[in-house]
UniProtKB/Swiss-Prot annotation:
The gene is atpF. The chain crosses the membrane at residues 26-46. Belongs to the ATPase B chain family. F-type ATPases have 2 components, F(1) - the catalytic core - and F(0) - the membrane proton channel. F(1) has five subunits: alpha(3), beta(3), gamma(1), delta(1), epsilon(1). F(0) has four main subunits: a(1), b(1), b'(1) and c(10-14). The alpha and beta chains form an alternating ring which encloses part of the gamma chain. F(1) is attached to F(0) by a central stalk formed by the gamma and epsilon chains, while a peripheral stalk is formed by the delta, b and b' chains. This is ATP synthase subunit b. The keyword Endoplasmic reticulum does not apply. It is a single-pass membrane protein. It comes from Synechococcus sp. (strain RCC307). InterPro entries: ATP_synth_B-like_membr_sf, ATP_synth_b/b'su_bac/chlpt, ATP_synth_F0_bsu_bac. GO terms for molecular function: proton-transporting ATP synthase activity, rotational mechanism. Keywords: ATP synthesis, CF(0), Hydrogen ion transport, Ion transport, Membrane, Thylakoid, Transmembrane, Transmembrane helix, Transport. One of its GO terms (cellular component) is proton-transporting ATP synthase complex.
Length: 171
């Protein structure tokens, strides 16, 4: 008994065969039912283990995400702290460099003042030495002239009188 339901598409005939024995539908349903019955535990166990593994992987991934997020936050915080520390060190270095430069300038000015003072002292000492040398030379010249002129001006009586006065002044 062949029952067909014609279904026409684009001038071609198409028919469905509803004969259960001819289409082997009972055998197919029976095989599928037996497979489901016998393999349900096996496939169910495999699927359950697979589901648990996937859930464990998801949980592990979530934990790693949380850990990575915390590590990222900590890293960002440490980076910000490192930047702050670096800026602080840079500011301190600039301040120290300015202080060193100012100290160097101050020392240079002090050294220049000391050198100038030493030069002035040397100049004054040299001027005093030259003045003293000129005085000594002038005195020597005056004494030489006086000694040269003295014998012409002094006679024996004046010489004796000069010697006596000198002795009285000493004595």
């Amino acid at each position: 008994m062949t029952t067909s339901l014609p279904f026409v598409l684009a001038n071609h005939g198409f028919a469905l065969n509803f004969n259960v024995f001819e289409t082997n539908l009972i055998n197919l349903v029976l095989v599928i039912a037996l497979l489901v019955y016998f393999l349900k535990g096996f496939l169910g166990g495999i699927l359950e283990r697979r589901r648990e593994a996937i859930l464990a992987d998801l949980k592990d991934a979530e934990e790693r995400l949380v850990t990575a997020s915390k590590a990222l936050e900590e890293g960002q915080r440490e980076l910000a702290q490192a930047k702050s520390t670096a800026e602080k060190i840079l500011a301190e270095a600039k301040q120290r460099a300015d202080l060193i430069r100012e100290d160097g300038e101050k020392r240079t000015i002090e050294e220049m003042a000391r050198i100038k003072q030493d030069a002035n002292a040397n100049l004054n000492a040299e001027a005093a030495r030259v003045i003293e040398a000129l005085r000594a030379e002038t005195a020597r010249t005056a004494i030489d002239k006086a000694l040269a002129a003295l014998p012409k001006r002094l006679n024996d009586a004046k010489r004796a009188e000069l010697i006596d006065r000198s002795i009285e002044a000493l004595g």
